[in-house]
């Protein structure tokens, strides 16, 4: 069945602006979200989701109470939630393979909601802006189209993307919202930023920059964050890129150079350094080709635990 808004079938294709004009409650929800102040989210109880990652859990989780992601410029952050059992998935999509990613998001939630007798699937899309290359617009269209193709009814509750998430300053465009968090217990979605993006922030960023596909990073049954094992081919011309100045890196390695947060270039440089240091990560970063496992300790912070079978 299709994508629905307030019980009505969504007519596609149409732009985000056309969609909210046809459904005023969507426009109001986007306005309220844009109007919020940004909350700084601390590490306790947080599961931070990087680009090309997804995480899913439920209110029964004793370790995780918040899912979040930020630094989205042309990217979109997607939250899919089952209202019956509260199972919630958050993912950071960059448009690399939306056709494969949406079914992955759906199956991650449905693995929780098989036994839910009531409730419905609700989706929230946030991110992007009116960028010159129209990458945000393309991703908005892809996500709406792919959710509309799924077998289940999916209710579009929040749409704050592309033109609806755009501000203009000195004739340049920027996103209004760069990051959001969702409270697993209350289902509240709010504007957020994060200082702690771990664990293994550089490794996870390197995997995405090297072209890795969307992956699920959390096992809610064991309440463990699981990374890898993953591999990548040596990053092409890594020494060349590390020799470039900040302006060149920003203009060449960003989808939206003017709209990036201040730490973007520093983040790219450190990720490139990591890729140079570990051109083939398999046995060095993943001893015995086993995953790296982390669990929240009693203070709500990530702690490394031994790999399975070690």
From Swiss-Prot:
PANTHER family: N-TERMINAL ASPARAGINE AMIDOHYDROLASE, PROTEIN N-TERMINAL ASPARAGINE AMIDOHYDROLASE. This is Protein N-terminal asparagine amidohydrolase. It comes from the Eukaryota. GO terms for cellular component: cytoplasm; nucleus. N-terminal asparagine deamidase that mediates deamidation of N-terminal asparagine residues to aspartate. Required for the ubiquitin-dependent turnover of intracellular proteins that initiate with Met-Asn. These proteins are acetylated on the retained initiator methionine and can subsequently be modified by the removal of N-acetyl methionine by acylaminoacid hydrolase (AAH). Conversion of the resulting N-terminal asparagine to aspartate by NTAN1/PNAD renders the protein susceptible to arginylation, polyubiquitination and degradation as specified by the N-end rule. GO terms for biological process: adult locomotory behavior; memory; ubiquitin-dependent protein catabolic process. Pfam families: N_Asn_amidohyd. It is found in: Cytoplasm. Signal peptide: none annotated. It comes from Mus musculus. The keyword Transmembrane helix does not apply. Keywords: Cytoplasm, Hydrolase. It is an enzyme of class 3 (hydrolase).
